[in-house]
C-alpha cells in the first residue's frame, strides 16, 4: 500500500499533521496503536494557557483543528492575565476528555484523502538516505516518500509509581520499543526525559462546600475564529491548597519517591514540577494551589491540577486526604511519572524534516517539547511541509516575528531544549506585542487560505474583521467627542478626567481606563460636537466629522483588537521597527556548504556548534548558544569578503 504521507501517532501532533497533509491533497495514512485513544489527553484535561493559548489561536488561523475541537467539547472557558498587558493575555478551556477524543476521531474519519489504521510501527524503511515507508509489528509494510513521527511518550516509555515501574506509553497503553534503537543507528542523538501526571479523584467524594469556586467567563471566549458562539452551560472548577500536614507526609515518604531515590535520572518540565518537587525545593512555601478540574460531563473523575506525583499509592492517598475538601476523597487512578525517549531537535531543519534522513519529519514530544499545544503546532507544520515535499515545493517556515509557532520551532532547531522538556511562554518571543492572541487571524489566515487549509469563507470573515477594525480606527480618529456634561459623566464613571474642549474620540480611547464601549456610549448619548479645526483638519491631518456612533459597533473580539492597537500604538510601532532590523539578519542566508571548521577566528566551541546545526541564516546563527556577537561578525565579514563560493570539491559534486 502506497501513500504520499504517513503519520505515525494520533495524539495532538498526529491529528494536525494528518489533517493538514490530507487537506492539501496528499494521500495520507495515520497509524496509531489504539483507534479508541485518538486525541487522548494523557495529563490535564485542558487546552490553552499563557503562551499555549497563543499557539492554539495560530493553529486555528492557519486552518488547524485544535481550536474548533476544544470549542466543540469544552466545559469551561476563561481568559487569563486579564489585568496584565495584551501581549500576555490568553484563553484557557477545560475539556471534556471523552468528547474531545470522540470529536477528534469523527473529524479525522470524515476528512477526504485520509485513511486511519490501527498498527504498531516497529521499523522505518530507509533506502539511499531517504525514508521509503514503515513496517508494523505484524509485518505489514506501508510505502511513502514522507513519514512524520509523532510518537509522544511512547518510545521506550516506562511508568513509575513509587518503586514499581512497568513498560507503557502511558497508563493503559503499550510502549513502542523498536523505533528508538533504529533512530540511534541512523545517527539521531536519543536522550531521555520525564513527565508526570496527577491521581484522578472521584468527584462524589469531594466536599465542594469547603472549596473556592472558579466559574467560567461569560460569554465563553472561543478559541477558534470560526466559532460563532459557545452556548453550552459551563461547569465550575474549584480551588484548594496543600498544607503543613500534606508537606509532612511528602517529606516523610521522600525516600520512596523514584525521583528522589535515584531510580529516575531524567529531567522533567521545570515549570510543571511534581508536588514532591515543590515541597522539597520551596520549603518556605506554606501551601501550594490545587485546582480541581472536572474531566467531563459524563464522568465523576476530577483532575487535581498541581498534585502531579510518582509517590507510592498509599502515600498518594494520605497526601490527598490531608487537603481541605478532600478528606474523604477516593483515588480512581494513581498519579505516575513516565520516562521516554526523545531526539535532539537540533538535528532538524526548520521545516521539521530531519537532516539525516530525507523525507522523515519529527513533531511533538519526540522533539523534547511538553504540552498538547506545542505538539499540535509542530504537527501542523510537519504535515504542511511533508505534503509540500511530495509536490516538490519549498518548505513553509514561520519567522520569530510572524508567529509563536515560529518562535517554538526556531528555538528547538537552533538552541535545542537544554536538557529539560521545552514549554512555550510569552517571554520566549522578542516581539510578543505583535504576536498577540487577538491578531493571530490577521497574521496567518492568508497563509492558511493559500495553503488550502482555511476555507475562503473563513478567510473572508477575517478580512472583513480587519476592515471593520481599520474603519473604526479611522472613524474615531476623525470624530470629535463634545465637552458636555453627558460626556464627562461617562468619563467619571470610568475614573477618567473630564474634558473642557472637544476631543477626538481616538484620543479618549488612548486613556488606559477608557474602553471602546465607553466611547460608543459617549458618541451615542452625546453626539459629536459640530466643531471644525482650522482648514477642516485636526492636528494629525485627518478630517474632523460630525456623526453619532456606528450603526454596527464592533463585536467583543474586534473591539479588543482596536483597543490594543490604539492604546499600544507607540509600542507596536517600535516593535515593528525592531522586526525590520531582525529581518535583515534573517535575510542573510548562510550556504549549507559553509566551512565553519576552517573559518579563522572562530572558537573551537563555535566551530563545533555551527557545523552541527548548520544555521540557515545569520540571524539563526546569532541565536545559537555559545555563538557570540564577535563570531557573528566574523561570519558576516567572511561572506562580505567574497569567500562565499563553495570550494572546488563541492562545485564538482553539484549537478
Model-derived features: positions:
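Core beta-strand elements of the Rossmann-like FAD/NAD(P) dinucleotide-binding domain
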Residues: 3, 137-146
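An anion/pyrophosphate-binding glycine-rich loop and adjacent beta-alpha core
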Residues: 34, 181-317, 325, 405, ...
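A glycine-rich dinucleotide-binding beta-alpha-beta segment and adjacent secondary-structure elements
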Residues: 303-369, 397-410, 555-609, 614
